[in-house]
């Protein structure tokens, strides 16, 4: 089975805009088409509460014929056109779909951050983890989120093995970002967020990239758009993950990044597993 995850940073822009950045996103989408994955998880869709428009659906069906889609968008009183997730999956797959709420603080449960697909023998779940925010203003809420999310995955894992993916908004260890020393109190590399991810893994999950590749350095999934040279210089962060229940980690045959060319921000990640 092949699965892909990508924080797209606006599905609407990627599908309908003709800006230079959107064209780069469209090139990445063509790369994903060629990958012919069974399941594609997409984060930060930024769609309205009504979800994809008719035009969005038409373009998706043109790009990905033979795929169903399911989505969850941010709902009031949460911010409009914010966060949001989507799955594309091949039509021969017939998952049971759920949109879990985990008892998160503030409006986090209404921001469209988690979708779970249940199959006979396993779960596939994606997450767009809340950012701790400028000035770490959301860090306390983020810590609650991390604990609640870990509990949620552990509950799934009691039923059957889990494949979990998404933008976790944390570089777990120093090897997972280019400049750890200068980012100690940056969102995504605070001690608190790193401890939250350690706790998540400790509930019974494996970071599949490290499982496959060991301590290979300078491999990242995100490069800041604010710096024009972040990708050229590879000053990146690894904040997107494919996790599996420990008991199926040895079934993973590939866990890697997909090249997204000159496009900064997130790059897609791929998992291949014998299930």
Swiss-Prot record:
The cofactor note from the UniProt entry for this protein is: Probably binds two magnesium or manganese ions per subunit.
| A GO MF term | endonuclease activity
Lineage, top-rank taxon, reads Bacteria
Q: Which InterPro entries match?
A: AP_endonuc_1 (IPR004808), AP_endonuclease_F1_BS (IPR020847), AP_endonuclease_F1_CS (IPR020848), Endo/exonu/phosph_ase_sf (IPR036691), Endo/exonuclease/phosphatase (IPR005135)
Main subcellular location: cytoplasm
Give, as one word, the top-level EC class. Answer: hydrolase
Give the required cofactors: Mg(2+); Mn(2+)
Q: Where does Mg(2+) 2 bind?
A: 167, 169
Q: Which NCBIfam families match?
A: exoDNase_III, xth
Q: What is this protein called?
A: Exodeoxyribonuclease
Give the organism the record lists. Answer: Streptococcus pneumoniae serotype 4 (strain ATCC BAA-334 / TIGR4)
């Amino acid at each position: 089975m092949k699965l892909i995850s990508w924080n797209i940073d606006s599905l609407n822009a990627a599908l309908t805009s003709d800006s230079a950045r959107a064209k780069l996103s469209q090139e990445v989408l063509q790369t994903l088409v060629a990958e012919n994955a069974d399941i594609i998880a997409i984060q930060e869709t930024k769609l309205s509460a009504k979800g994809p428009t008719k035009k969005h659906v038409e373009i998706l069906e043109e790009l990905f014929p033979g795929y169903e889609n399911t989505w969850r968008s941010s709902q009031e009183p949460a911010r409009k056109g914010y966060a949001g997730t989507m799955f594309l999956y091949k039509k021969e797959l017939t998952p049971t779909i759920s949109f879990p709420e985990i008892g998160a603080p503030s409006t986090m449960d209404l921001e469209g951050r988690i979708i779970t697909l249940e199959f006979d023998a396993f779960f596939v779940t994606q997450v767009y983890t809340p950012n701790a925010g400028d000035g770490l203003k959301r860090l306390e809420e983020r810590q609650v989120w991390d604990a609640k999310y870990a509990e949620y995955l552990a509950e799934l894992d009691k039923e059957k093995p889990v494949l979990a993916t998404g933008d976790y908004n944390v570089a777990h260890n120093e090897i997972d970002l280019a400049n750890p020393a200068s980012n100690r109190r940056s969102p995504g590399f605070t001690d608190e967020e790193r401890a939250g991810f350690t706790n998540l893994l400790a509930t019974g999950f494996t970071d599949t990239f490290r499982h496959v590749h060991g301590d290979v350095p300078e491999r990242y999934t995100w490069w800041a758009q604010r710096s024009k040279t972040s990708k050229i210089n590879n000053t990146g962060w690894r904040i997107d993950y494919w996790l599996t229940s420990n008991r199926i980690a040895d079934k993973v045959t590939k866990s890697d990044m997909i090249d997204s060319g000159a496009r900064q921000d997130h790059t897609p990640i791929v998992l291949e597993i014998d299930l």
